[in-house]
Design a protein with these regions (language model features):
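Bilobed "Venus flytrap"/periplasmic-binding protein-like clamshell domains
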Residues: 2-66, 168, 182, 188-198
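Extended aliphatic helical segments
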Residues: 4, 13, 22, 33, ...
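Pocket-lining segment of extracytoplasmic ligand-binding domains
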Residues: 9, 46-151
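Aromatic-enriched hydrophobic runs in primary sequence
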Residues: 14, 19-21, 36, 65, ...
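Ligand-binding clefts/hinges and TM-proximal coupling segments of bilobed small-molecule sensing domains
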Residues: 28-37, 115-181
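An extracytoplasmic/periplasmic, membrane-proximal ligand-sensing/linker region
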Residues: 76-94, 99-101, 111-114, 142, ...
Length: 198
């Protein structure tokens, strides 16, 4: 999860979003769902903002660059092109991109993981990805194949088998899939989301 801002905005921790103009993601998106849940875990809500926007990553990056918002949430793989472009644009303007940390021991992370076991794990956005001053601790969210329990076992098995037999092709097409491994796939068995028998 990215919480993106610029150094000149003075946002160092999630509580600093109070009184700021913040985009929580496009309406109904995974980003919006995750942002609202993390804010709730931090004891915040969009009512605490000076203004809430509901923009996608590209629109949020443009709004931040133009000074129309102070921060935005984005849930996506590393790197995200619009954030790379934002970092370059801010540098040309004499500012610098900053990511708000969500350390593993912080209240928002601890509360979120207790409420939703098996949905996320502590992660790090390395400073090299966007040219930030430091590595940024965050919550990593996993991609899931979601299907109804009524999906035939053979079909679920065939999807799973095809995915894991073609990981190299998947990783070439989607760089963020580098973390798609059998070990990660079974990491959350018994968590909040039940696994299909297939």
């Amino acid at each position: 999860l990215h919480i993106v801002t610029r150094e000149s905005a003075g946002i160092r921790v999630i509580q600093d979003l109070k009184g700021k103009r913040v985009s929580t993601g496009a309406p109904g998106s995974g980003t919006e769902v995750e942002a609202l849940l993390v804010l709730e875990a931090a004891g915040l809500s969009p009512k605490d903002f000076a203004k809430q926007e509901r923009l996608g990553a590209q629109e949020s990056a443009s709004a931040l660059s133009e000074g129309n918002i102070d921060a935005f949430f984005w849930s996506g793989g590393l790197p995200t092109g619009s954030i790379v472009e934002l970092a370059a644009t801010l540098a040309r303007k004499g500012d610098r991109i900053q990511l708000v940390p969500l350390p593993p021991q912080s209240t928002p992370v601890q509360v979120f993981q207790r409420r939703f076991p098996g949905v996320s794990a502590p992660g790090v956005i390395p400073k090299e990805v966007y040219g930030t001053r430091n590595d940024t601790p965050t919550l990593s969210f996993w991609n899931f194949f979601i299907c109804p329990a009524s999906l035939p076992e053979e079909a679920a098995y065939a999807l799973t088998k095809a995915t894991f037999e073609n990981l190299e092709a998947l990783r070439q097409a989607v760089p963020a899939a580098r973390n798609t491994t059998l070990e990660n796939a079974v990491r959350f068995v018994g968590g909040a989301i039940p696994y299909h028998e297939g």
